[in-house]
Amino acid sequence: LSAWADKGWVPDVLGVDYAGLIAKSPHTEGHEAHDHIWKNLRAISSEFKILLLTASQVNKEGYNSWYLSKVNFTGSKGIWAHANAAIGINMSEFERDSQICRLNYIVLREQEFLGELPSKYVAVAGSPHRGRFHLISRFI
């Protein structure tokens, strides 16, 4: 990114596939290593003023949860400390067959500007293979 920035170009969006696979520093272990990764990702997005997107795997309880929350993720609390927003993406078998997924906020930094964190979800349907998605419900 620095080399591109030096040439006058910085992307608007950077996707990291995915944060859990980033090599850990040999000087850190366990939760400290995870925290270090998330801290660095946050620093990159702040320094270059870009939207940085990544993914994280849920624990086994997350597969049966209607809404995803912080308890559905293992590892460091650094994920939540450094993310501006974390959005859960989930679907039942019926929804998968119908090409519908549910999105809900897990973390939303500066949510005081929005009031309370919305407790409901938004459902999105469409043809993901063609990149055509449609909003079929809204936060209530």
Regions found by a protein language model. Name each.
Residues 1-15, 28, 46-48, 60-140:
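C-terminal regions of RecA-like/P-loop NTPase motor modules
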Residues 12-49:
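Helical hairpin unit composed of two closely spaced alpha helices linked by a short loop
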Residues 21-23, 59-62:
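Short, active-site-adjacent cap segments at secondary-structure transitions
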Residues 54-57:
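Conserved H-loop
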